[in-house]
Swiss-Prot record:
Source organism: Magnetococcus marinus (strain ATCC BAA-1437 / JCM 17883 / MC-1)
Assigned keywords, A-Z: Methylation, Ribonucleoprotein, Ribosomal protein, RNA-binding, rRNA-binding
UniProt GO BP: translation
One Gene Ontology term of the molecular function aspect: structural constituent of ribosome
Post-translational changes noted in the entry: One or more lysine residues are methylated.
SUPFAM superfamilies, A to Z: Ribosomal L11/L12e N-terminal domain, Ribosomal protein L11, C-terminal domain
Taxon lineage: Bacteria, Pseudomonadati, Pseudomonadota, Alphaproteobacteria, Magnetococcales
Protein name per UniProt: Large ribosomal subunit protein uL11
PANTHER family tied to this protein: 60S RIBOSOMAL PROTEIN L12, LARGE RIBOSOMAL SUBUNIT PROTEIN UL11M
The protein's role, per its UniProt record: Forms part of the ribosomal stalk which helps the ribosome interact with GTP-bound translation factors.
């Protein structure tokens, strides 16, 4: 029989740098999970990713206090900021002038990387989703 899932935990940790300090420690500790076991497993799975890139993770907590986790791709905003060479997006998007520019080729590259996590059937729909994220950040797609 399958294990009974008691909770789901959503976290965002830097690749290869999960530590038992907040936010990881308290989130896992309140469910009685072994924090160091998660940190070691997460760091091992993200060792080949770009260091310090934010990696969303969905942790399934089982009744016997064991867990499994699923890694997602980094957020679109992370890829867009990297492509535009910015530290952050606009404070008032669509009112202030664009803070940066990304090309459609860059948008397509980001869409291909994010395709597994996006709710899109084809690359064109994924490109529109990423372009919308860029617009919300105050970036101009050229």
């Amino acid at each position: 029989m399958a294990k009974k899932i008691t909770a789901y935990i959503k976290l965002q940790c830097p690749a290869g740098a999960a530590k038992p300090s907040p936010p990881v420690g308290p989130a896992l500790g309140q469910h009685g999970l072994n924090i160091m076991e998660f940190c070691k497993a997460f760091n091992a799975q993200t060792a080949n990713m770009e260091p310090a890139s934010p990696v969303p993770v969905l942790i399934s907590v089982y009744a016997d206090r064991t867990f499994s986790f699923e890694l997602k791709t980094p957020p679109a905003s992370y890829f867009l900021k990297k492509a535009a060479g910015l530290q952050g997006g606009s404070k008032a998007p669509n009112r202030d002038p664009a803070v940066g520019k990304v090309t459609w080729a860059q948008v397509e590259e980001i869409a291909k990387a994010k395709m597994v996590d996006l709710n899109a059937n084809d690359i064109e729909a994924a490109k529109k989703i990423i372009a919308g994220s860029a617009n919300s950040m105050g970036l101009e797609v050229v």
